[in-house]
Every structure is written in C-alpha cells, then in structure tokens.
Amino acid sequence: MTHQPQQSPQFFLTAPSPCPYLEGQQERKVYTHLVGDKANEINDLLTQGGFRRSQNIAYRPACEVCRACISVRILAGEFEMTRNMRRVWSQNRDLIGRVHKAQPSTEQYALFRDYLDARHRSGGMSDMTVLDYAMMIEDTHVNTQIIEYRRRGPDSFMSAKGDGELIAVALTDVMADGLSMVYSFFSPHMQERSLGTYMILDHIERARAAGLPHVYLGYWVEGSRKMQYKIRFTPQEHLGPRGWQRFEG
C-alpha cells in the first residue's frame, strides 16, 4: 500500500446549486484546503491551473453540462492602455495605493458594507458580518496583501502615503508568476472614477514593476454582464483544454 505525503491536497466536490452567473444553470465546484507549509506553493500551482482562492479554500468549477467559466490572466508586459483606460488612469492620479499586511479594519468593513449594499444587495455575500469579513481577509496561509487606495495628501510626495478617506480596497495574492486579484471593492458613490478599472490597471503596473508576467482576474463567463469587463484588458490568456491560449479580443 502506498501513502500520500501528509502535505498532498485532498479534493472534494460540492453538491449542485444555482449558478450565480447564468440563469437556469447549475454549478458544482471541486475544492481543496490551503493549509500547511506548502499552502503557498500549492496555491500558485492551482491558480495557474484555473483555481481561485477564497480564504483557505482553492476551488474551480466542475459543472456537469456547462464549461462557460474561463480562467483569464492579463499579459502585463505586453498590455497597453486604451484611450478610455488612459482617461481613467489620469482621472485617478490623485490616489495612492498602499500595501498592507492582510489585516481587516473597521474602515475597510464600512466601505465593504457600503459597496455590497449598493452593488450586490441580493448576492451571496450580502449578509456578511464584520467577523465574516475578517475571516475573508485573515483566514489564509498564502502570501497575500491588502492594497488600500486613498487620496493623496500634502505630504504624500515625501511619505508615499495617502491621508484621505478610504476609497477602494484590493485583496491580492502575490505569486511566483503574477498577482491574483482575489477580491476588490470600492466606493459606490464615485462611479465617474471607474475604480474597478483603475485597480486592475494599477495591478498591471505593480506586476510590471515587480517583473511578474501575469495579473489573474479569475473567471470570465461569456454572456454574463457581470464579467464582460474582464476581456477589455488585452492581450490576455484564457485557460482551455490545451493550456493557456492567447486572446486578443
């Protein structure tokens, strides 16, 4: 009899449930726990294989009749902003994104709550408490960080810190080959800033500066309005049966 090493992940399959993206479809997920000394290495490998992370769980769609969820990653080194993206970048030049350890705060939760109530009132995360939020941020064994976006202050040039109100937050995993945007949220009262687009652009610039080739955006679902924004950031790669394939839009 052979024995698996203690650090080898075990995979499980969820029961069918209604798909949050395509009406009338059922979703199932295969998942594993990211724990132990190898959690960071396993998370890297699984993300490169189409998994996403939520707390200490890595999961991937395993639907019986649908293959609509496609993993997407931006080729950071080749990316060029469109005219509209340059406008968004310029419009947010008064913001500073500062990296912090993955620790929750009451200020973050207030913004998170405001975002959910305005944008995802009927979503699966709508009833998350402050303790649920804290677990989303802290319950991890992988290399992750919080990026807080604030307005620049009078001393920002010297300190590289923003001292204004918290406007946007990104929870981001740092991997061997890129940055993975786990979750992000922003003030719903500043639609003119296109903060979701801005944070993706900022992550592309951060990946470039760190010499990392990819920014992982999670899943794109053709036909889902919620997901359409992801294919605007080209060139990118989509994960299919033959591995990662280039996509130009």
From Swiss-Prot:
GO terms for molecular function: arginyl-tRNA--protein transferase activity; leucyl-tRNA--protein transferase activity. GO terms for cellular component: cytoplasm. It comes from Brucella melitensis biotype 2 (strain ATCC 23457). InterPro entries: Acyl_CoA_acyltransferase, Asp_Glu_LeuTrfase, N-end_Aminoacyl_Trfase, N-end_Aminoacyl_Trfase_C, N-end_Aminoacyl_Trfase_N. It is an enzyme of class 2 (transferase). SUPFAM superfamilies: Acyl-CoA N-acyltransferases (Nat) (SSF55729). Belongs to the R-transferase family. Bpt subfamily. It comes from the Bacteria. Its EC number is 2.3.2.29. One of its GO terms (biological process) is ubiquitin-dependent protein catabolic process via the N-end rule pathway. Keywords: Acyltransferase, Cytoplasm, Transferase. This is Aspartate/glutamate leucyltransferase. Its main location: cytoplasm. NCBIfam families: PRK01305.1-1, PRK01305.1-4, PRK01305.2-3. It holds the Pfam family ATE_N. Functions in the N-end rule pathway of protein degradation where it conjugates Leu from its aminoacyl-tRNA to the N-termini of proteins containing an N-terminal aspartate or glutamate. Disulfide bonds: none annotated. It catalyses: N-terminal L-glutamyl-[protein] + L-leucyl-tRNA(Leu) = N-terminal L-leucyl-L-glutamyl-[protein] + tRNA(Leu) + H(+); N-terminal L-aspartyl-[protein] + L-leucyl-tRNA(Leu) = N-terminal L-leucyl-L-aspartyl-[protein] + tRNA(Leu) + H(+). PANTHER family: ARGININE-TRNA-PROTEIN TRANSFERASE 1 (PTHR21367), ARGINYL-TRNA--PROTEIN TRANSFERASE 1 (PTHR21367:SF1). It is found in: Cytoplasm. The gene is bpt.
